[in-house]
Design a protein with these regions (language model features):
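Short, well-ordered alpha-helices that flank and scaffold nucleotide-derived cofactor binding pockets
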Residues: 8, 12-16, 120, 144, ...
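Conserved catalytic-core segment of NTP-binding enzymes
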Residues: 97-98, 102, 108-194, 205
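Walker A/P-loop phosphate-binding motif and the immediately C-terminal alpha-helix
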Residues: 1-28, 96
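Soluble periplasmic/extracytoplasmic beta-strand elements of cell-envelope proteins
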Residues: 5, 72-74, 163-165
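Residue-level signature of catalytic and energy-coupling elements of molecular machines
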Residues: 4, 50, 73, 106, ...
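Amphipathic alpha-helical transducer elements in NTP-driven molecular machines
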Residues: 44, 58, 86, 90, ...
Length: 257
């Protein structure tokens, strides 16, 4: 369960609350956001087309059919990652900021061009990590880049606000010593915990059907993302899905949601 799942869920959550939101796929060459958002057949132009002046921003933006406050800007599957330029991305973000309350940048894993550009322009950063040593180590490396190579760092402005999102979390597996605990991850990364998303079959089901999991209000993962959006917007929501749940007969029979 990765960054694209989270970007789609948070963007949808913000839009469903009435905030005009754009979500941009920075993973040039792969392009998964449109699949998770269920709009892959509606892609005509993409991020690189706009940067290269082959299409306008309005031509490339896809309005979500479930929520009219949400727009998707897909990545290109065919272009090289070097097609992304600081100037080009900066212009797009500046234009979007005139009309949108929130712009969610879906950053690819690693430190390739798309990731570094998404981080460069960030005001807030959702650090999405799994409770595994390798994933947490990668996140720690990303935090170093956010602190030193962002536009805010270059200009000596207030640093990027960083929030920790812990995905695929299982209290049962933590108890067995198979994954890091919330406390372990927080101690390593020294970040404010925005939320924990439990390991859940509903995430895969949602992705396969082209629906952000936050729309599945009956699932644990959907509820967790809704809580995360609420906390980000300043609401006081108690953390859930961190402690081991005492299961009754019903939940033992039917498993996790």
């Amino acid at each position: 369960m990765g960054k694209t799942t989270t970007s789609a869920a948070i963007a949808m959550g913000l839009a469903k609350r009435g905030h005009k939101t754009a979500v941009i796929d920075f993973d040039v060459g792969l392009r998964n956001l449109d699949l998770i958002m269920g709009c892959e057949r509606r892609v005509v132009y993409d991020l690189v087309n706009v940067i290269n002046n082959e299409a306008t921003l309005n031509q490339a933006l896809i309005r979500d059919k479930r929520c009219d406050q949400l727009f998707i800007l897909p990545a290109s599957q065919t272009r090289d990652k070097d097609a992304l330029t600081t100037e080009g991305v900066g212009k797009i973000l500046e234009e979007l900021s005139k009309d949108f309350k929130y712009i969610v940048c879906d950053s690819p894993a690693g430190i390739e061009r798309g990731a570094t550009l998404a981080m460069y322009f960030a005001d807030d950063a959702f650090v999405v990590t799994n409770p595994e040593v390798s994933s947490v180590r990668d996140s720690d490396r990303m935090l170093g880049i956010l602190a030193s190579k962002s536009r805010r760092a270059e200009k000596g402005e207030e640093p990027i606000k960083e929030y920790l999102l812990l995905t695929r979390y299982s209290p049962d597996r933590v108890k067995l010593g198979e994954m890091l605990s919330v406390e372990d991850v927080q101690e390593i990364l020294s970040l404010h915990l925005l939320g924990v998303i439990p390991e859940s079959k509903s995430v895969l089901n949602a992705s396969n059907s082209g629906n952000p999991v936050i729309l599945d209000e009956q699932s644990d993962a959907g509820q967790a993302y809704a809580d995360i959006v609420a906390r980000y917007l300043g609401e006081n929501k108690p953390h859930r899905f961190i402690d081991e749940e005492k299961k009754g007969l019903f939940s033992k029979l039917f498993g996790s949601k």
